[in-house]
Structures are given as structure tokens and as C-alpha cells.
Amino acid sequence: LIRHFGSLRTIWSASAVALDKALAEVGGRGCESCGEGGWAVGAAIVAARHLAEAAAREALVGEAVDTRTPEFRHYLVRRLGLRREECVMILYFTGEGLFIAEDFYSSGQRGEVVIPLRRTVRRAFDLDARRLVVAHNHPSGSALPSDADVAATARMRAVVEALEVGLDDHCIVAGNAIASMRSMGLM
């Protein structure tokens, strides 16, 4: 797999289909109990990734969340740091900062991510969320916010705050690096 994907990070972020295809190309062994042509290795790697994400999410539950804490940053890296396509996550919190839920959106394109404002506002009201955090990744490797990121954040902040929902931060993840637009003075 390393020969095919080039690194453990790339293996970790690959889909089960891509993993199984790579295994088939190098004569990997299938899982006889998985059915005709079934592969268990790709599914097991993806399941392990989901388990690691759930364990990181668990650290957010039950306590007020601060975007500067190592636990929160670890969670964002787990969810977004290795993805090859730009994705956006909206995290919903109570007024006291307790984690309620998250929504995950993928644009499937590099260099562009759209924050779904209508869906975000509707979901915030459905959850009775009082605070939001936006996070998205830059597969390019630079966590620095673009001009488009700054403009989208300002637009979102104006919309949600007019509806009495706070936008606490917009974090950008690139690999293991995270930039907080709030900490950078961009919000």
C-alpha cells in the first residue's frame, strides 16, 4: 500500500474502494467471507479512521469547547487534515459552549469551498444552537486563510449574528497545521 499511495497519511485518507483496488493491483489477499471479490483490509482501515475520529469527538462532549485547546485542534486534524478535497465542517454549540452536533460538507474541488448559509442557519435553529465554529481544510498544505475565506467568514458572521447566533471562529486545517481566523484578528 505504501508503494501505491506513497505514505501512511495518504493510505489513512483513502477510501475503502481505493484501498481495495490498490491491494488487487499488487495481488493482495481478499476476504473469502466477505463475498465474491470482497476485501476486508480497505474496510478495516476506513473503520479504524472512523473510530479514531469518534474518539477525538468524544473529547469535545460534556465540556465547554475552546477552539484553542489541543483536544479541539486534534479533532479538526483528525476530521480534515488528511482529506484531498476541500471540505467544510460546521460545529454547533450551546450558549455555554457545549458541543451539540456537526455537519460535514465536501465540495469535491480543490481551491474552493462553499459555506452553506441557509442550511447552517436552519440547522442552528433546529438544534437551538447559540454558537458556531466553521472549519475547513486546505489540501494545498497552507493553513493561511485566503481572501475568499476572509470574505465568506465576514458574510457568514453578519448573517448568523443578525439572527442571534455567534460565530466563534473559523479554523483552517492543512495537514497538522491549524490557523484560527479569530486568533489572527480576522474576525
Residue ranges, per PLM feature:
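Short, intrinsically disordered/low-complexity patches at protein termini
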Residues: 20-23, 64-68, 123-126
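Generic recognition of cysteine residues
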Residues: 31-34, 87, 171
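Long amphipathic alpha-helical segments
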Residues: 1-61
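Generic alpha-helical secondary structure signal
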Residues: 9, 17, 39-40, 67-74, ...
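Active-site-proximal loop/helix of nucleotide/amide-processing enzymes and allied scaffolds
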Residues: 37-44, 74, 78, 92, ...
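Non-catalytic interface/targeting segments
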Residues: 56-106, 182-187
